Amino acid sequence: MNGLFDTYHIRRAFSRAAHSYDTNAVLQHEVEQRLLESLDYLGDRIPRVILDVGAGTGRASIAMKKRWPKAQVIALDQAMPMLQEARKRSHWWNPLALIYGDARTLPVADASVDVIFSNLCLQWIEDLPTVFAGFRQALRPGGLLLCSLFGPDTLIELRQAFAQADAVPHISPFPSMPQCGDALVLAHFQNPVLDRDLFTLTYDDLSALMRSLRAIGATNALQERRTTLTGRGRFAATAAAYETLRNADNKLPSSWEVIYACAWAPTSEPMTRENNHEIASIPINSIPIRRRNSS
């Protein structure tokens, strides 16, 4: 096995979570709604083809189909049971196009898509520059990319608690905002704008948090993870370390950092160049972190 992530494990985890996902993905739905609102960047433009990468159960795809009924909305996911859930939501008189596929190798023609939308999918891919380059290639000139992904402060409390129990990695190394911005620039996207939120969810205990993660398919997919069950001793040590963070409401907090990115595929006009390098601005300095609490 090569690479940081076990892609087979990721596919299997999300396949198993297909039936429980929507009931438990409260945060994912909130982020999805915020990303959908960012489609206003299109102004009066009406997209003909929209690609939803990592579409899951198809909620966002259906929302975009409702907004632009004449557009072809393609829901792409690597977990077939997720697409089966999306098919149940899709209206027979104006259906989605459902495609089983991977964000790393988009099964669409070059310059054929007006909008690529991807909600909380790309943190499972280690080579963001290559993936973004594939997105740019699929977009028509001037096409829009809107995506969200988890940042490095996601599950930081759980990461630290596990670290006190053993030295085996349990949480993925999520990309930072500068890394996302650099990846967009390397892929030659224009005018990238990034933002972020820091959400705090709360749980009764560690077991409740772990059940919630399994229900949305967010399990440890690292290649170097321990493949045997976590022993009672290690789990107890992790739980004890986490207990020190219990808040005034007698709940355990769990941080989720979300990075949002908006960028445009180049038009036929060349980008600004300086010293033989293409220049793009990324306004990431002084971006506020908005803290939101939900339980």
UniProtKB/Swiss-Prot annotation:
EC no. given is: 2.1.1.197
GO BP annotations listed: biotin biosynthetic process; methylation
Q: What is the protein's given name? A: Malonyl-[acyl-carrier protein] O-methyltransferase
Q: Which organism is it from?
A: Xylella fastidiosa (strain M23)
Q: Which SUPFAM superfamilies match?
A: S-adenosyl-L-methionine-dependent methyltransferases
Summarizing the function annotation, the protein's role is: Converts the free carboxyl group of a malonyl-thioester to its methyl ester by transfer of a methyl group from S-adenosyl-L-methionine (SAM). It allows to synthesize pimeloyl-ACP via the fatty acid synthetic pathway.
Q: Does the keyword Transferase apply?
A: yes
Q: Give the reactions, separated by semicolons, that this protein catalyses.
A: malonyl-[ACP] + S-adenosyl-L-methionine = malonyl-[ACP] methyl ester + S-adenosyl-L-homocysteine
Which family would the database say this protein is a member of?
A: Belongs to the methyltransferase superfamily.
The annotated pathway is: Cofactor biosynthesis; biotin biosynthesis
Q: Which Pfam families match?
A: Methyltransf_11
Q: From which domain of life does this come? A: Bacteria
- Intrachain S-S bonds: none
Extract the coiled-coil ranges from the record.
Answer: none
Q: Which UniProt keywords apply?
A: Biotin biosynthesis, Methyltransferase, S-adenosyl-L-methionine, Transferase
Look up keyword RNA-binding and say if it applies.
no
Kind of enzyme, top EC level?
transferase
This entry's Gene Ontology molecular function terms read: carboxyl-O-methyltransferase activity; malonyl-CoA methyltransferase activity; S-adenosylmethionine-dependent methyltransferase activity
